[in-house]
Swiss-Prot record:
FAD binds at residues 122-137, 148-180. It is a single-pass membrane protein. One of its GO terms (biological process) is tRNA wobble uridine modification. It comes from the Eukaryota. Pathway: Protein modification; peptidyl-diphthamide biosynthesis. Disruption phenotype: Simultaneous disruption of MCR1 results in resistance to diphtheria toxin and zymocin. Belongs to the flavoprotein pyridine nucleotide cytochrome reductase family. Optimum pH is 5.6. Active from pH 5 to 7.5. Keywords: FAD, Flavoprotein, Membrane, Mitochondrion, Mitochondrion outer membrane, NAD, Oxidoreductase, Transferase, Transmembrane, Transmembrane helix. It catalyses: 2 Fe(III)-[cytochrome b5] + NADH = 2 Fe(II)-[cytochrome b5] + NAD(+) + H(+); 2 Fe(3+)-[Dph3] + NADH = 2 Fe(2+)-[Dph3] + NAD(+) + H(+). This is NADH-cytochrome b5 reductase 1. The gene is CBR1.
Amino acid sequence: MAIDAQKLVVVIVIVVVPLLFKFIIGPKTKPVLDPKRNDFQSFPLVEKTILTHNTSMYKFGLPHADDVLGLPIGQHIVIKANINGKDITRSYTPTSLDGDTKGNFELLVKSYPTGNVSKMIGELKIGDSIQIKGPRGNYHYERNCRSHLGMIAGGTGIAPMYQIMKAIAMDPHDTTKVSLVFGNVHEEDILLKKELEALVAMKPSQFKIVYYLDSPDREDWTGGVGYITKDVIKEHLPAATMDNVQILICGPPAMVASVRRSTVDLGFRRSKPLSKMEDQVFVF
C-alpha cells in the first residue's frame, strides 16, 4: 500500500500539477500572424490618432489581450482592400513591436485622395476591420547585425526606421549606431518627431537624427534645407569604406531612386531591384 501511495504522489507531481498550472495560467500566447498562411485575417480598428491633415496612427485590435502580431523587426504586412469590385493590396510596416505591444498593433498611414488602400484606411470608422496577411519582406533586423546603420527616410517611410530604432533602444545589449536623415516638405509633416527624439534620449551616443525640409516655414529652422543629395548622405551617414555598415532607404519612389544613385556614386555596392538582407544598401 505504501508503494502504491508513493506512486500516486509521483503521478500527481508529474502529471496533475503541470496540467493544473497550465489551466491556471492559460495557454501560451502564439503570434497571430503565420508566414506559412496565405489567407487574409480581419482585425478591427480600435483607435485612431490624427497626426496631420492627411496622416494618422491607426491601432487595430488582436483577438486576445495577450496576443502579439508576430512580426519580425523590419518586416511588413500586406493589406487588402476591395476597390470597385477589384482586390488591391499594399504593404505597410507597423510601428509597434511584439516586444512592447500586446493585444493590438499600430500603423502609420498617409491617405491620398486618389489612393486605393490608403484612402480606404483613412475612411475607416472605429469597429471597421481591415484584412491583412504576413509577415512579408527580406529584412529581419537582429541585435548587432551591423555596427552602423545609415537611414534615409521620407514621409511615412519613417515607419520601418522607427521600428528598428525602437528595437535597438529597448535592447540594452544592442550597440548598433544609427544615423538617420529624415526628409519632409514642411515641418508639420515630420511624423513621430517626439517619439524619435525620445529614442535619441535613450541612447544619445548611438543615435543621430538630421531633419531636412523642402520648404521650411520659419526663418529660424535649424535643420537641413532641400533634397537629400549625395553631399547630404556623405556628410551625415557612414561611409561605404567603414566596416559592417548598411544603408536603409524608404520613402516616395522619386526620392528612393535619387538616393540609390547617390549611394552608388559614394562607393556603396549597387543595390538590387529586390533588396536582400545582406545587401550594403537595402530598400524597403
